[in-house]
Curated annotation (Swiss-Prot):
Subunit structure: Interacts with L1CAM; this interaction occurs in axonal growth cones. Interacts with actin filament retrograde flow; this interaction is enhanced in a netrin-1- and PAK1-dependent manner and promotes F-actin-substrate coupling and concomitant formation of traction forces at axonal growth cones. Interacts with RUFY3. Interacts with PFN2. Interacts (via N-terminus) with KIF20B; this interaction is direct and promotes the association of SHTN1 to microtubules in primary neurons. Associates with microtubule.
Keywords: Acetylation, Cell projection, Coiled coil, Cytoplasm, Cytoskeleton, Developmental protein, Phosphoprotein
Region feature Disordered, mapped onto this chain: 343-405, 418-445
Originating gene: SHTN1
Protein function: Involved in the generation of internal asymmetric signals required for neuronal polarization and neurite outgrowth. Mediates netrin-1-induced F-actin-substrate coupling or 'clutch engagement' within the axon growth cone through activation of CDC42, RAC1 and PAK1-dependent signaling pathway, thereby converting the F-actin retrograde flow into traction forces, concomitantly with filopodium extension and axon outgrowth. Plays a role in cytoskeletal organization by regulating the subcellular localization of phosphoinositide 3-kinase (PI3K) activity at the axonal growth cone.
Protein name, as recorded: Shootin-1
Similarity remark: Belongs to the shootin family.
GO cellular component, one term: growth cone
Localization, UniProt: Perikaryon; Cell projection, Axon; Cell projection, Growth cone; Cytoplasm, Cytoskeleton
């Protein structure tokens, strides 16, 4: 019952360990996927930040150009105003010169006076519209035209720059929105990573608890094994003492008044029984060891014999293949000779030739020197009745015959042991050999789990 419970507990621990390892691997894969997504989002964010920085640089450049153009425009405005002021001054000077000239012309006649009056009327109108009039000189007109053209071009450039500024502002808004989205996605990914880390920590705790439980169970199992061995040895000693007491009581009952010789005989008998029991135990241990050695030796011998049989079978196969090829060649030759004879028969229908001689018999197969050499070695190594058995085993046999031979050998060996030695019952000695293998497998699995936990 204890062994079955321990096996169940070990199976449960192994299943829990496998589940924990599977969950750990899934979580690791998900963590790698999230890391890859996070790296991609980081790259996109870095690209967006670079684009934003480029847009900021371009916007700063545009703003600097606009400021430069505005300064240039203000300078041109001041130049135009100064040119207009010069034009008004020149106009006034021209008017004063005209008046002076007209005064000088008044001395000439009335016609000149009428012209002067007309000039005065024109002066009254030109005083009101002096700012709008153009300069009479060619240089002023050229400067004004150039300034107007520059103003128009500057206004057009200003409009273009304003449109570009609006576009850049819209792009900036889009980039800011993308950055905010990336930040939100990053926050979501960080939360998922934290959750996965928590789950991983839980799995690690569960696996650590499983490992601790396994170690405790292993320690308990070893303690139970030691206690069982001690109990068996104690039970054996008690059994020996009980047998001693039974014999002594039986002898005491037979003789109501025991003598000294009888007591000595009883003591000697008890000592002899004790020695016999000890020798029996030692003999049983030796028999166990010899049995294990014999099993190992028989297995090695069987493997060696099977290998030799394989080699011999391969050699026989090669010989048979050669014989088959030779027989095929002979059959071809015979067919060819039959065809030739048939042709001859057809040619000479009248004259019947005597029948051809029969083909010579096939030569016997050549003896195999390797097989004979191996049989000689076996005869020398096993010179008794076992030699005949080994020679039979060297011949190619079926697996059923091999198993029968094994069974016979084991039965003979057991009969010899039984005749010479009284063995223990089967329940005490026969123990399942699969347990240590399963425990070794569990130990290796637990060691792997410990290594995984240590690597983290």
């Amino acid at each position: 019952m204890n062994s079955s419970d321990e096996e169940k507990q070990l199976q449960l621990i192994t299943s829990l360990k496998e589940q924990a390892i599977g969950e750990y691997e899934d979580l690791r894969a998900e963590n790698q996927k999230t890391k890859e997504k996070c790296d991609k989002i980081r790259q996109e964010r870095d690209e967006a930040v670079k684009k934003l920085e480029e847009f900021q640089k371009i916007s700063h450049m545009v703003i600097e150009e606009v400021n430069f153009m505005q300064n240039h425009l203000e300078i041109e405005k001041t130049c135009r105003e100064s040119a207009e002021a010069l034009a008004t001054k020149l106009n006034k000077e021209n008017k004063t010169l005209k008046r002076i000239s007209m005064l000088y012309m008044a001395k000439l006649g009335p016609d000149v006076i009428t012209e002067e009056i007309n000039i005065d009327d024109e002066d009254s109108t030109t005083d009101t519209d002096g700012a709008a009039e153009t300069c009479v000189s060619v240089q002023c007109q050229k400067q004004i035209k150039e300034l107007r053209d520059q103003i128009v071009s500057v206004q057009e450039e200003k409009k273009i720059l304003a449109i570009e500024l609006e576009n850049l502002k819209s792009k900036l808004v889009e980039v800011i929105e993308e950055v905010n989205k990336v930040k939100q996605e990053k926050a979501v990914l960080n939360s998922e990573v934290l959750e996965q880390r928590k789950v991983l920590e839980k799995c690690n705790r569960v696996s650590m608890l499983a490992v601790e439980e396994y170690e405790e169970m292993q320690v308990n199992l070893e303690l139970e094994k030691d206690l069982r061995k001690k109990a068996e040895s104690f039970a054996q000693e008690m059994f020996i003492e009980q047998n001693k007491l039974k014999r002594q009581s039986h002898l005491l009952l037979q003789s109501s008044v025991p003598d000294q010789q009888l007591s000595k005989a009883l003591d000697e008998n008890a000592k002899l029984t004790q020695q016999l029991e000890e020798e029996r135990i030692q003999h049983q241990q030796k028999v166990k060891e010899l049995k294990e050695q014999l099993e190992n030796e028989t297995l090695h011998k069987e493997i060696h014999n099977l290998k030799q049989q394989l080699e011999l079978l391969e050699e026989d196969k090669k010989e048979l293949e050669l014989k088959y090829q030779n027989s095929e060649e002979k059959a071809r030759n015979l067919k060819h000779s039959v065809d030739e004879l048939q042709k001859r028969v057809n040619q000479s229908e009248n004259s019947v030739p005597p029948p051809p001689p029969p083909p010579p018999p096939l030569p016997p197969p050549p003896p195999n020197p390797i097989r004979s050499f191996m049989s000689m070695i076996r005869k020398r190594s096993h010179p008794s009745g076992s030699g005949a058995k080994k020679e039979k085993a060297t011949q190619p046999e079926t697996p059923e015959e091999v198993t029968d031979l094994k069974r016979q050998a084991v039965e003979e060996m057991m009969d010899r042991i039984k005749k010479g030695v009284h063995l223990r019952p089967v329940n005490q000695t026969a123990r399942p050999k699969t347990k240590p293998e399963s425990s070794k497998g569990c130990e290796s699995a637990v060691d792997e789990l410990k290594g995984i936990l240590a690597s983290q």
